[in-house]
Amino acid sequence: MVIRINDKNQNYNNVTKLLVKPIKNKSVIGDCPLCKSKNVYLYDTEKFDDLTMMFDDLLSIYTPVSLLPQSYPKADTRLLKSELIYSWNIFNRKSKADVYNIITAICKEKYEYNAELFDQPVGIQELYDSDYLSKHSLLTTNSWEDFVEALKTKNRFHTHYVDLDLLERFCSYIRKPYKTGKIFYRCRISSEVGISATEMGAPPIDKTTDGRANARGIRCLYLGDTAETTIYETRAGAYDYVTVGKFQLKKDIIVVDLKKINQISPFIEGLDCLEYAINKEYLNKINDEMGKIMRRSDSPLDYVPTQYITDFVKSIIHDGKQEYAGIEYKSVMHSGGYNLALFDPDLFECIETEVYAIDTIDYKKHIV
């Protein structure tokens, strides 16, 4: 059976963009038989094997349920087509049947001699292999909760609970460059008069408090992707005045995009798919922790896990220089927005300000 694939059959995201190049390089323009799109790139799996080689490494980490140990939790198994959709974000979620047809066409030889891999629930055997985990797990405790508790109550600065070499490697896969002139925003509650551009930057050391990416006394410039994001993040009340500063980047920088730490493409050259797969739970935890809502009543200790991750990113050196200028993470308060935490506040300059009055706030609630 010939299955033709176009780039609209995939979520064009951080995971799947590496698939698009072979599709476009060895494709024809036509109408897709799956999604019915017109005049798109079509890839013939009968003629080319580029995608076959790309998927082979990923599929090799899975074992059909019939070959897994009896002790392997059945709840941790599911069909391969579901894994590709939900664990790896490779294909869109409209039709599992289409995904099945696509993957069996791409990997037709593997399907011929190992149909169980495609037709039975599958699992990753190493998830419960203590010897493998001891050598490849991001957390030596094998528990995010134990790691957080240790940071808060035992040893904050010289912990051995994290494989820092592995964390650095994961960070290298989510590098994000910004060019000189890039614009971000910062908001502060103010009076009707507003705050001058020269005072819109990071607070001085003696006024620096604990934040998501910095400990008390360590300066850090927090910016948002839009003025709206920064206003939401400020949590201003109804009838407050806020000053929004427009900040311009003064030189090229590279940051770690923690929004993508759990969306690393399995097709990146050099990535160990198995090692990444067994650590996805912890990477999801890092992503969740960066996006965790903090309440006024919460303890500053609740910032410690993200401060630890941020301080490590800040410490990464390459060729005698700091590798990363900051971290990027999703906005807690504004869906779809994101924030940038800069280790050096002087990398950006506030070039103009606007004063806004907050007219109304739309409160939403639920019973707890």
Role assignments for model-derived ranges:
Residues 1-181, 186-214, 237-368:
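Active-site and NAD+-binding cores of ADP-ribose-processing enzymes
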Residues 227-238:
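Short active-site loop/helix that positions an aromatic residue
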